[in-house]
Amino acid sequence: MQPATPLVLCVLLSQVLLLTSAEDLDCTPGFQQKVFHIDQPAEFIEDQAILNLTFSDCKGNDKLHYEVSSPYFRVNTDGSLVALRNITAVGKTLFVHARTPHAEDMAELVIVGGKDIQGSLQDIFKFARTSPVPRQKRSIVVSPILIPENQRQPFPRDVGKVVDSDRPEGSKFRLTGKGVDQEPKGIFRINENTGSVSVTRNLDRETIATYQLFVETVDVNGRTLEGPVPLEVIVIDQNDNRPIFREGPYIGHVMEGSPTGTTVMRMTAFDADDPATDNALLRYNIRQQTPDKPSPNMFYIDPEKGDIVTVVSPALLDRETLENPKYELIIEAQDMAGLDVGLTGTATATIMIDDKNDHSPKFTKKEFQATVEEGAMGVIVNLTVEDKDDPTTGAWRAAYTIINGNPGQSFEIHTNPQTNEGMLSVVKPLDYEISAFHTLLIKVENEDPLVPDVSYGSSSTATVHITVLDANESPVFYPDPMMVTKQENISVGSVLLTVNATDPDSLQRQTIRYSVYKDPAGWLNINPINGTVDTTALLDRESPFVHNSVYTALFLATDSGNPPATGTGTLLITLEDVNDNAPFIYPTVAEVCDDAKNLSVVILGATDKDLHPNTDPFKFEIHKQTVPDKVWKISKINNTHALVSLLQNLNKANYHLPIMVTDSGKPPMTNITDLRVQVCSCKNSKVDCNAAGAPHFSAATALLLSLFSLARL
């Protein structure tokens, strides 16, 4: 039997090796189940096993190491998942990373409410045990690689391994993708012989959460033998980001007297960590309230939603009794669901207690006194009120109304926007002789309506007693203006009218004296006692001081008061026209060519300062008594113009032609004007009047000049 023992051992050893080889061929490295659904209990109990995870690297699991994405759970060496403390984590996802020198894999654990999935936890696990894991028939075996972010030195460090059971001898592994040969380059690399994947530096999940890499085998010439096969690298989140309030400033408003539980505002923070983990699960609380009166807890914040609500009775939200209607809250957001290990961030919430019109304005006293001189206008008294509401709102701003004692609308009242006082003004002069006293009833209200349970009381009305002081009023002309119509040129000393001024101070015995104030032409005089106005010069309608036939003068009436008062009256004198102005012609100079075929010389016009009918039609004539020559002719064009023409051509010279023009007044007025006619040479379209410099007279004129010269000898 002994000789057979080595043979038997060899046979047994070959069978063991064969079985082991067969087992290796049937083994797939990794978790036997990739996804687990866990019913949410009322609470995970510390150190209580939740489930068992089965991982195999097909090499005996030597140096097996587990990592859990949540710091509140761990996996024991036997594969049992346990909670490190009593905790709730509804709807969250956990990742378990298993790794040996030969393989690594990741399992996903979804913690859900009992209604989210069908069946019990035991049924799910039973289904998982009876459901085979599908296998991919390929020689390159890859599993997702999980790498915690923010790892420390040393680098590079192995994070996973790719297995190819059928890799030909001499072939190599090649790794490509973002993070390898694409930006950011050089983060990952693979041992081309062993398939070990390593990371060269620490990772930041908030920058890149996953990397999609590709593995393939290539021959010595770089040609692909198998693949590429996708390899996913998942960066496991760490709680390395504090919550941040990004939407400030945070300002909220709540009306005073609001019921308990009134929502003021919402404050939410942002956490850059993985939202599927407690690293970004935020809880809110109020760290500080300023001021802390009348209660240190005026507000409450929903720890999950961030809604800030009132928690005091409406009576404590009385803006008028608060030291300061503005509250500042330091709001803290903490991740890890508010646990002590969580990171925090803070922001300030400013809450304004807004005013409502729950206080009516009240006069500071029931009666006000005012004194005003008759004839004076403007503000005579300021009415003061008190209102406890917010001075920046319509609940405080006052609106005043005169409700009695102002039938003549002599008074108005307006609100001073700075002081809220009522400024009572006289807008029409008061007459002491008519009424020396006035009594007004004033009402005050707010711009905004009062709240339903508040009304205006007796303190919202006040009486104003106004005393009018007598003043020496100026005499008043009646009528004013005074108007009279007279012919111009009436004789000097003619009486135009008698003016009349009365003194409004009927209770005083005063005398009135008259004087001239403005008399631009100096034509008038007034009797200081009786007011009779007469002329001191001829009244000329054509004077530059007369406008549209009206002359204006001003007179003064001064009483004997102390000090005296003076009134002004206006006199308008309408002057009727008389024919006292002779007409005159225009132009008075003309030119004509010595060889002109058209013998027309000039068209004359006439004007008259008088008014119609003392003006046109005008009569134009050549004063024949001094012009016997029969070389000129004048012809009527219309009522105001005539044409002067030649009967024959004349030599170059200056000719003086007397023109007589007569108006249509009764009696008519006549004016004789010399028309100077220059006869010029007009050769080759050039006008030369130099030879016309010497005057030319008619024969009769020459004879008269000769006789005059002889007489002087």
Swiss-Prot record:
Glycans are attached at residues 52, 86, 382, 489, 500, 530, 598, 638, 671. Residues 1-22 form the signal peptide. The gene is CDH13. InterPro entries: Cadherin, Cadherin-like_dom, Cadherin-like_sf, Cadherin_CS, Cadherin_pro_dom. GO terms for biological process: adherens junction organization; calcium-dependent cell-cell adhesion via plasma membrane cell adhesion molecules; cell migration; cell morphogenesis; cell-cell adhesion mediated by cadherin; cell-cell junction assembly; homophilic cell adhesion via plasma membrane adhesion molecules. This is Cadherin-13. One of its GO terms (molecular function) is cadherin binding. Residues 158-172 have a biased composition (Basic and acidic residues).
